[in-house]
A protein has these predicted regions:
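Flexible "arm" and connector segments at domain edges
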Residues: 1-74, 78-105
Length: 105
């Protein structure tokens, strides 16, 4: 495993990759009635707006809500961010590599 994470945490984090794989499949197939399809069809403006809205909701919960509410809103924010990343051909692993490169410890 990783020096920072136990094996359960690594499996939990691996779900972000699985989620992006699913979102990429939605992007390729664009099934009718899918919320993810609706986001892709709305273009960058719609996706960016949703990332912004969900980020604000997460901030509000961080300031005034419970940890469970904060986690819920952060999950929405991450989902919408992954949709936006996918639309730009960027993988969540690209963000992990960037963060790892910045880590000096």
């Amino acid at each position: 495993a990783n020096q920072f994470l136990g094996s359960k945490n690594v499996k939990d984090l691996a779900f972000l990759t699985e989620l992006q794989d699913f979102i990429e499949k939605r992007h390729a197939e664009m099934p009718e009635g899918s919320y993810t399809t609706k986001l892709f069809k709305g273009g960058a403006a719609k996706m960016c707006k949703k990332v912004g809205e969900e980020t604000i909701e997460a901030i509000v919960e961080a300031m005034n809500g419970t940890n469970d509410q904060f986690i819920y809103e952060c999950s929405d924010m991450i989902y919408h961010l992954i949709v936006l990343l996918t639309s730009k051909g960027i993988r969540i692993e690209d963000l992990a590599r960037e963060l790892k490169a910045r880590h000096k410890g």
